[in-house]
């Protein structure tokens, strides 16, 4: 098509060599010592003739001769003009002829907006927690433009004699997550729950904890899949709603966007721990924080340490969250499979006395030096042991060792100074 005019490119005959005949001549010539052969070629007509193209062009001229009115039920919803019809026309070779068709994506693009007000979005199935049990909330089919039906209706109206009017309709649109999908995952009842106290927290820290809990709420971990805290929660940035809190840097608490992330990670870790899930990655805080279970805390950082655990159950796990300004709770829902976890905490060992730390602050006044008092808490190591049983049989045992540093005073040097060493650098303000 050139605009609204079909352009016919004439066909032409070709030539073809009879390969079997040529091969026989070559063999005979070789046996008789003849230096060459004469091969004959035959004329071959094109599979698609100029006449076939002219016939298709005539049909195309009819198709673009006038607009096609569009109706949905009893509603006039618009029309397709000749230029639009021309842009949608396609010529498909079919048994020695050209079959006229309309591009399906083009039909969808042009017609879907015209019937959008009559369509309905599908609703995914979901879960509703009632006490310790889970109920499946049924999904619902939606409706959308019937593209195949619209193709046939518009093409028929455009190429056949009579009224140039096409009736278009809708077809069912299934949800991405159906009721059957939801039931098949085996998410039926609570299998673990864990709550941590916020401890002393600013309003920003509480906000961040609640925000991360909302990002995690409703996460489904299918059997054999691994949960990654950083992948699910994503980067902690102001653009995603996070506020400035605090993070541990060396022996100091410093301002940082997303402070409170470790509260969330610690609560999740303890759920995975109590359910006996394999923990693929976990890191303790550099300090011991008393409002977390000793040896069972978890710290994460975007682009750095992560918390990862694997669902080794026979069914999927649904994570649900609840919180107040003083507590955070995660609950895991699945199907119970006779699992029991027995844990014990070893003694504190390898005690370390606090020593001064030396930090460099590029934002401090030139030549400055100041000391920030630490808590003077001792450092130590501790190991938590875990045994996982299923139906009374031991299936796994593992341990988690934490190394907590001693927290001494911090001497902070500004530019133009000569510290004895630099243990860490404060972020520029």
Task: Tell me the role of every PLM-derived stretch.
Residues 12-13, 244:
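RNA-contacting regions in translation and RNA-metabolism proteins
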Residues 15-16, 28:
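Transmembrane hairpin
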Residues 7-8, 136:
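Amphipathic, non-membrane alpha-helical rod segments
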Residues 24-429:
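Well-ordered beta-sheet/strand-loop patches within structured domains
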Residues 2-6:
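N-terminal targeting peptides and non-cytosolic leader segments immediately upstream
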């Amino acid at each position: 098509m050139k605009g609204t005019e079909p352009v016919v490119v004439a066909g032409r005959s070709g030539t073809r060599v009879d390969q079997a005949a040529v091969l026989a001549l070559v063999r005979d010539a070789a046996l008789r010592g003849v230096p060459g052969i004469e091969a004959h070629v035959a004329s071959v007509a094109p599979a698609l003739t100029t006449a076939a193209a002219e016939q298709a062009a005539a049909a195309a001229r009819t198709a673009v001769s006038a607009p096609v009115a569009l109706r949905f039920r009893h509603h006039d919803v618009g029309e397709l003009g000749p230029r639009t019809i021309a842009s949608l026309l396609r010529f498909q070779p079919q048994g020695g002829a050209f079959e006229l068709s309309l591009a399906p994506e083009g039909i969808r693009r042009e017609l879907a907006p015209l019937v959008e007000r009559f369509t309905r979005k599908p609703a995914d199935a979901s879960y509703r927690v009632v006490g310790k049990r889970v109920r499946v909330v049924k999904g619902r089919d939606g409706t959308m433009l019937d593209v195949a039906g619209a193709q046939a209706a518009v093409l028929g109206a455009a190429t056949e004699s009579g009224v140039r009017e096409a009736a278009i309709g809708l077809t069912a649109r299934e949800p991405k997550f159906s009721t059957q999908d939801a039931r098949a995952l085996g998410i039926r009842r609570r299998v673990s729950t864990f709550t941590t106290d916020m401890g002393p927290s600013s309003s920003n820290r509480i906000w961040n904890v609640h925000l991360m809990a909302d990002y995690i709420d409703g996460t489904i971990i299918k059997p054999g899949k691994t949960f990654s805290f950083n992948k699910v929660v994503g980067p902690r940035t102001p653009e995603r709603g996070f506020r400035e809190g605090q993070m541990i840097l060396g022996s100091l608490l410093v301002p940082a966007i997303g402070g409170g992330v470790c509260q969330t990670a610690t609560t999740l870790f303890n759920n995975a721990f109590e359910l006996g899930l394999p923990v693929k990655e976990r890191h303790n805080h550099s300090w011991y924080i008393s409002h977390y279970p000793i040896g069972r805390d978890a710290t994460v950082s975007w682009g750095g340490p992560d918390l990862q655990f694997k669902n080794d159950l026979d069914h999927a796990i649904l994570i649900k969250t609840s919180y107040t300004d003083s507590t955070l709770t995660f609950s895991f829902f699945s199907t119970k499979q006779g699992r029991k976890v027995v844990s014990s905490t070893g003694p504190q060992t390898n005690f370390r006395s606090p020593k001064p730390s030396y930090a460099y602050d590029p934002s401090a006044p030139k030549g400055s030096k100041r000391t920030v008092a630490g808590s003077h808490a001792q450092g130590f190591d501790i190991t938590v042991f875990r045994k996982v049983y299923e139906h009374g049989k031991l299936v796994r045992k593992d341990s988690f060792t934490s190394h907590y540093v001693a927290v001494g005073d911090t001497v902070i040097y500004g530019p133009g100074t000569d510290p004895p060493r630099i243990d860490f650098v404060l972020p520029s303000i």
